[in-house]
Structure formats: C-alpha cells, structure tokens
Amino acid sequence: MKKYFVLLALMVVAWPGIFAKRIPPPKVISVTQAGITYSAAGDGRSGYVIASDAKTGSELWRVKIYHVHVNPFMEEDVQWIYISGLKLSGNALLIRNEAARCYRLDLEKKSVRNYRCTEELSIKP
C-alpha cells in the first residue's frame, strides 16, 4: 500500500511538468555591426534587446522593446511573448516578436517605435 501511495504522490508532483504549456522560445540569431553584437534576451516576460561587445561579450546596454501584460488569473508562461527575429537596417535594429509585431530600435538614441513588418526577420530554423 505504501508503494502505491508513493507512486501516486510522485505522479501528482510530476504531472504539471509532463505536458508543456507552450512550445520553447524561438532561437534568435544575434547580429553584429561595428564591434557590437545585438541579441534578444531570453526573458519572455518583456522583450529586451542586449548590446554587448563583440570581442569580450560584456554587456554594454539593454533596452526594453515592449512590455507583456500578464493576466494574474492565467498561467504566466503561456502569456509570455518572445522576440523571434532581429535584423540590422542602417543605424537601426528591426525586431519581430512571436505575436508578429515589429519594432524599430534607433541604435544611437536607443528609442523604440512600432514598425510595419514588410519582410521576414532572420529566424534560426
């Protein structure tokens, strides 16, 4: 009887982890220009872009591209929206997220504005 109780307890504890609530975030290809590498932060709660030194890898700055509004009555992880693509365009970084929204980050001013998606941004297969 004790074995069945232990087995039942293990199943109850492990059950939430058996079925993933969402697919893994997309693999985003970092882009480099003028010795600076731009990458998407792995946090889906808010879309951040990180700029780091291409040689040392040390972080230079990070900018919040968008905020994800989370409904407290729903599971949090299914509401996260990850960045899915980055592309350099002159002195700007074009960003696309899983919700098919696009943003333009001015790399000098570090200002963000909405951008009309006209092409696919680089997404690792």
Model-assigned labels for residue ranges:
Residues 18-125:
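Secretory-pathway ectodomains
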Residues 4-13:
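Sec-dependent N-terminal signal peptides
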